[in-house]
Amino acid sequence: MNEMTHRTKTRPVKVGNLTIGGNNELIIQSMTTTKTHDVEATVAEIKRLEEAGCQVVRVAVPDERAADAIADIKKQINIPLVADIHFDYRLALKAIEGGIDKVRINPGNIGRRHKVEAVVNAAKERGIPIRIGVNAGSLERHILEKYGYPTADGMVESALHHIKILEDLDFHDIIVSMKASDVNLAIEAYEKAARAFDYPLHLGITESGTLFAGTVKSAAGLGAILSKGIGNTLRISLSADPVEEVKVARELLKSFGLASNAATLISCPTCGRIEIDLISIANEVEEYISTLQVPIKVAVLGCAVNGPGEAREADIGIAGARGEGLLFRKGQVVRKVPEETMVEELKKEIDVIAAEMAAEREKEKETQEQ
């Protein structure tokens, strides 16, 4: 059996101003829910996704109106834009002409070779990568006839078939996804894909469900895949506001130490010793830090006796008691604050530390560029 390709060893592929593959960073993606031809609504949703931490966004391109809107959308957003194309190669050509940063297709359903070749040549000319989207629910008939039902081996065979179509045209800026709604099937498919080729892998559990159920299902499946060193980019697919997809993705990556640009909240599960409204405070603080782009760790704990010691890895935190709270940094108490102002005091400290971290990161960046 071939050795599994770790995410750091995958082939680097440029998507807009980002590099996917060849490093340990995972890029968070989402997809718009608007009609793409409605430029104003689509841009507004993308702006919300950007603010939440989305790094790449995909739009459906089902018709010419959608393809024609790409150029206008691109002018108004700050993250790479991906066109989702099915069947009609002319829509891919229009999207590429409009300045799209990546195209998601299955070469096998675009049509005859000359159509695929036209898309590949246009993408190659503009330096645009292609994502091959393998889905357990839409495998080719001959593969289903061979295996009887969707299997990991069948999904990998489909991916290799599509990869070969592009490679035969001397095209190698390829990203591959192996999506399934069955968690175990998805895990097996991604493992086998990581052994079969070294192209970057886009992770996802498709049709995972509503906000609650889909979050659990995606975390279970993608967490198992991430823990094996597989995956270069991911989308949490939810029947919910796409901003929620980004929030879940950020939390998942933080759990594995794979998010260097996101804040983390540490909070206790509550018990009978608590004298403050810890749940509402934790929710308020979580919302406050949700858009921070620095790896600050913030703790909200209900016990002033054990709290600071239990969260000594936190950059800043509060531990509540009746009438007052302890503000602490790295496990050391800084000062006592009145209960009615302790959340505001915590927010002030968060702002200071976040600014320091951002300045330090900028300084490191300037040093590296010299």
UniProtKB/Swiss-Prot annotation:
Keywords: 4Fe-4S, Iron, Iron-sulfur, Isoprene biosynthesis, Metal-binding, Oxidoreductase. The keyword Glycosyltransferase does not apply. Transmembrane segments: none annotated. Binds 1 [4Fe-4S] cluster. This is 4-hydroxy-3-methylbut-2-en-1-yl diphosphate synthase (flavodoxin). GO terms for biological process: isopentenyl diphosphate biosynthetic process, methylerythritol 4-phosphate pathway; terpenoid biosynthetic process. Pathway: Isoprenoid biosynthesis; isopentenyl diphosphate biosynthesis via DXP pathway; isopentenyl diphosphate from 1-deoxy-D-xylulose 5-phosphate: step 5/6. It catalyses: (2E)-4-hydroxy-3-methylbut-2-enyl diphosphate + oxidized [flavodoxin] + H2O + 2 H(+) = 2-C-methyl-D-erythritol 2,4-cyclic diphosphate + reduced [flavodoxin]. GO terms for molecular function: 4 iron, 4 sulfur cluster binding; 4-hydroxy-3-methylbut-2-en-1-yl diphosphate synthase activity (ferredoxin); 4-hydroxy-3-methylbut-2-enyl-diphosphate synthase activity (flavodoxin); iron ion binding. [4Fe-4S] cluster binds at residues 268, 271, 303, 310. Its EC number is 1.17.7.3. Its cofactor is [4Fe-4S] cluster. SUPFAM superfamilies: Dihydropteroate synthetase-like, Nitrite and sulphite reductase 4Fe-4S domain-like. Converts 2C-methyl-D-erythritol 2,4-cyclodiphosphate (ME-2,4cPP) into 1-hydroxy-2-methyl-2-(E)-butenyl 4-diphosphate. The keyword Oxidoreductase applies. Belongs to the IspG family.
